[in-house]
Amino acid sequence: IGQRLVANSSRPNDTFTFTLLDSPDINAFALPGGFIYVNRGLLAYLETEAELAGVIAHEIGHITESHHSRRSTQQTTSTVLATTAYILTGSGDLYDAAQMYGAEVVSGFGRDMELEADAAGAEFMHRSGYDADALLSVIGVLKDQEMYRRVQAKASGKPTGTYHGLYSSHPRNDLRLQT
């Protein structure tokens, strides 16, 4: 599945490695160098090959869109600005505030990158002969799991915080479904 998607991506000559992790967590992620990981826990919620292709295509999208290098540049810029503010003012509080602001800015770009990866992944799926709507199905599964975690937390008296908090790199799943 992965190699078929790569062959129909914007970087068909790059080398990608796909690994299934024995983890119950509902997650998948990409690392620089074309390394893509899917957790066993996510597979339990997928019903079709096309849905798995959607997960993998989204992660390929992070790599083809150079999200890792863009995020690194943004983080470096944020650190330089915070350090400059500290040097100019001598205020540790200003440094901390600048770092927090920088983290939020980087996080905001991350949300945009998630939507870019969704769009790139949908294109790679289409070119590979998969129904790109399967990616929407996966996002729907993630939204359902997010709601389930909230209900469980509330029922057990725990805070109903969500994975998609202030500094999360992912947009809300309902926003992703609308896009």
Name every feature range the model reports, one short phrase each:
Residues 1-179:
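A Zn2+-metalloprotease active-site environment signal
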